[in-house]
Amino acid sequence: MLVVDASVVVTACLSEAGLDPLAKEQLVAPHLMWSEASSVLHELRWRKEISNELAATALRRLSEADISPRRPKGLTDEAWRIADRLGWAKTYDAEYLALARLLRCQLLTTDAKLKNAGTRVVGVIGPTEL
């Protein structure tokens, strides 16, 4: 099982292969991942960094992704503790770390800042480490 964050999901949804390279993994994410990923895709399209067609394809891939939403008991409290420990004002990224910690699995991200800070809390890997 792997927790995936919006950065890795958006990257996959925009790639030619989509999420296929992650098909062998059981993927989970906190509920906020879908809002974050959708927002990133919308912003990329709005800024004209991606075409309308690619945005539509990526959004379809996101909605069809075989990723299970998870909200275990204590997720919010754990995210607050992690944000405090790491000196973060916001709990968005901490929620991914908290989910991985509560489920006793690793977090997969392409976000270097999250990876560097998060390794103090839980196992965090990038796509090349799969």
State what each model feature region is.
Residues 1, 34, 97-130:
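Acidic, PIN/NYN-like endoribonuclease modules and their adjacent C-terminal/linker elements
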Residues 1-34, 44-57, 130:
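Short, well-structured N-terminal submotif of metal-dependent ribonuclease cores
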Residues 5, 54-57, 78, 82, ...:
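Residues within well-formed alpha-helices
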Residues 9, 37-41, 99:
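Buried hydrophobic packing segments
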Residues 12, 36, 78, 116-117:
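Phosphate- and divalent-cation-binding pockets in alpha/beta enzyme and binding domains
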Residues 38-70, 75-79:
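Active-site-proximal, substrate-binding regions of enzyme catalytic domains
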Residues 67-113:
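Active-site neighborhoods of divalent-metal-dependent phosphate/nucleic-acid chemistry enzymes
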